[in-house]
Amino acid sequence: MAKISPFLWFEGNMQEAVTFYMSVFKDAQLVSMNPGMATFELLGQRFLALNAHPHHKFNDAISFFIDCDTQAEVDYYWDKLAEGGGHQQCGWLKDRFGLSWQITPDRLVELLTDPDAGEAQRVMAAMLTMQKIDIAKLEQAYAG
C-alpha cells in the first residue's frame, strides 16, 4: 500500500533537527540516520530528512498540525517546539529550524464547527486574540 511521508530539506543541520524532534515527541522512533539522510517517526507519522546545502527554505505554506486532547498537551508541545523559534497567532509557531507547527486542541475544532453560528463566531473571535490556544478561554467565549 502506498504511503505519503513528508520529506524535509535541512540546511546542514538535519542531524540536530532530527535529534531535537526525537526529544520532543515521547513515542518517536529513529528508523535510520547517517550524515546525509534520516528516516524517523513522530506520533506514528513517518518523516524523511535530508542534510543539504542552503537552497530551499521552509515557509508557512505548509505546517504540521498537532491535535491535542488537553491543555497540558497544548502547553507541552507549544513550549518545546517554540524553544529557539517564535510564537505566532492562532496556535501557530515556528521552530528553531524554520518549520511551522499548529498546536491545536481538539476542542477548538469542535467549538468552531458548532451549529450555532453565534457561539462559533465568539470562539473564533477569542482564538484570533491568542497565540497559544487556551481551552478555558475558548469555553468562556463559547458560553457567552
What are these regions, as identified by a protein language model?
Residues 28-59, 102-106:
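Conserved short beta-strand elements that form part of the metal-binding/catalytic scaffold
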Residues 4, 60, 87:
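Exposed loop/turn and edge beta-strand positions of beta-sandwich/beta-sheet ligand-binding modules
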Residues 18, 41-43, 54-67, 75:
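Serine endopeptidase catalytic core focused on the charge-relay Asp
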Residues 6, 21, 40, 81, ...:
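Terminal peptide-recognition signature
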Residues 5, 37, 89-90:
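Conserved beta-strand and immediately adjacent loop positions that scaffold enzyme active sites
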Residues 14-15, 64-110, 114, 132, ...:
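Vicinal oxygen chelate
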Residues 1-19, 24-32, 63-64, 107-144:
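N-terminal beta-strand motif that seeds the catalytic metal site of vicinal oxygen chelate
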